[in-house]
């Protein structure tokens, strides 16, 4: 707050003095993002109902399943430290000479399924599969099936059986 008191640059979002003044009367100086607050309330209810330990375990299980699929496809997962794979997403590299963004576009067009892109220097070299939040086993299997079908349609060299390998890790 001290930094904003002396700041001379124009600002709106970080104008804390207006927020503090309005809060004295129980108000807020701008239109609050009430829909975000309602969404947060529901998300917290869901989190508490499942239990934090169960949520963390589910995300880790889904990460293992996604990596099992990539391994079965013969594709490399991108993680500098293999013991520190993310429970939130799995980054999968496509073989040299193939474009991950073209694969993503094909999958989006054919199956209406969105995959994450590689960021920075990895753009076009890998795609990212998210497996966190409101996500269950069937959603993951559908995602992996969409990827496997997309790999086939795009002519990207891979082995079949990624979905089966993933199922074996979570059934």
Where are these regions (language model features)?
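Conserved PLP-binding catalytic core of the aspartate aminotransferase-like
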Residues: 76-110
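General structural feature for long, well-ordered alpha-helical segments within catalytic domains
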Residues: 36-39, 43, 55-58, 62-66, ...
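Active-site C-terminal subdomain of aminotransferase-like
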Residues: 1-72
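Flexible, glycine/charged-enriched surface loops at secondary-structure junctions
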Residues: 51-58, 72-81, 118-119, 154-164
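Short amphipathic alpha-helical segments
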Residues: 24, 86-90, 125-128
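Short, glycine/charged-rich beta-strand-loop motifs at protein surfaces that mediate ligand recognition
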Residues: 89-94, 115-117, 130-137
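PLP-dependent enzyme catalytic core of the Aspartate aminotransferase-like
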Residues: 121, 125-171
């Amino acid at each position: 707050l001290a930094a904003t008191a002396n700041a001379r640059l124009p600002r709106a979002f970080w104008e804390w003095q207006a927020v503090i003044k309005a809060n004295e009367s129980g108000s807020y100086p701008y239109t609050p993002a009430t829909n975000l607050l309602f969404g947060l309330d529901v998300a917290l209810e869901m989190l508490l109902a499942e239990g934090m330990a169960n949520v963390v375990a589910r995300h880790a299980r889904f990460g293992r399943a996604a990596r099992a699929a990539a391994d079965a496809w013969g594709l490399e997962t991108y993680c500098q430290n293999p013991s520190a794979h993310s429970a939130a997403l799995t980054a999968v590299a496509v073989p040299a000479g193939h474009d991950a963004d073209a694969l993503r576009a094909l999958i989006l067009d054919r199956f209406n399924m969105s995959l994450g892109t590689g960021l920075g220097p990895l753009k076009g070299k890998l795609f990212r599969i998210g497996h966190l939040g409101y996500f269950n086993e069937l959603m993951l299997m559908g995602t992996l099936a969409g990827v496997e079908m997309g790999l086939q349609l795009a002519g990207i060299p891979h082995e079949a059986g990624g979905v089966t390998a993933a199922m074996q890790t979570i059934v």
